[in-house]
Amino acid sequence: MRLLLTNDDGVNSKGIYTLAKELQKEHEIIIAAPSIEMSAKSHSITIAKPLFIKEVELDDINATTYSISGTPADCVKVAMDKILDKPVDMVISGINYGTNLGIDILYSGTVSAAIEAAIHNIPSIAMSAEVKNGDINFDTAASIARELVKISQENSMKGNLVLNVNVPCLDKDSLKGLKVCQMGGRTFTSYFEKIEKNKEVSYMLKGELTNNHKPTTDIHFLRKGYTTITPLHYDLTNFKIMNDVSNWF
């Protein structure tokens, strides 16, 4: 298969490097990723300034690689329009440093890059790896990504489908398996810390994660040692309440 790789941690991150090294064993890959870290950029795009595209090299990676001065969504958009000389079969975003569970999905540049691919009718997978006590296992996540690409190909994955995948911080042999599940109820209780320095006042976002989830969710199963897979789409319409809202007017 012909795959486009992207991420939000930047073109020089270990996550995308490990992913590329694993997937190039069986696939043709092209990399288009942000020149710097673009975490939590969600689906933002650049509209008021030009994007700069620079071809770079990654050691031991057999792929044409582009460093782009934009967001993860920018990278996919500009790759589709200006970089790719022929279509790709799938877009893989990641491997993200840290999970994208529950409401994280809405803030995630990793997931949004995958959703941008779906907007272009290209199937995509967003890969994220758990960080636990400062440790992360990119090798496990990359191996899982390779398996999922094969499974997706065998099942003719649709172009408007995104798989949000989160891999526990475990060796592959210790994983309990794959679990398809829904988003969990995860919120970020935020507050801003006031900082006064050099006669200037600034505010730094702080806070804690609060998990309010059912035993059918990505958060629950990841904690149990499963790789979680949540199918996503970009239509945010709340169909359950549409008729009720129609009756308001």
Curated annotation (Swiss-Prot):
GO MF annotation, one: 5'-nucleotidase activity
Keyword set for this entry?
A: Cytoplasm, Hydrolase, Metal-binding, Nucleotide-binding
Q: Which cofactor does it need?
A: a divalent metal cation
Q: Where in the cell is it found?
A: Cytoplasm
Cofactor: binding details: Binds 1 divalent metal cation per subunit.
Enzyme Commission identifier(s): 3.1.3.5
InterPro entries (UniProt xref)? SurE, SurE-like_Pase/nucleotidase, SurE-like_sf
Top-level EC class as recorded in UniProt: hydrolase
Q: Which SUPFAM superfamilies match?
A: SurE-like
Q: Which Pfam families match?
A: SurE (PF01975)
**Gene Ontology CC: one annotated term:** cytoplasm
The residues that the entry says bind a divalent metal cation are 8-9, 39, 96
Q: Which reaction does it catalyse?
A: a ribonucleoside 5'-phosphate + H2O = a ribonucleoside + phosphate
Please give the chief subcellular localization of this protein: cytoplasm
Described function:
Nucleotidase that shows phosphatase activity on nucleoside 5'-monophosphates.
Q: Which family does it belong to?
A: Belongs to the SurE nucleotidase family.
State the protein's name.
5'-nucleotidase SurE
Give the organism, scientific name: Clostridium tetani (strain Massachusetts / E88)
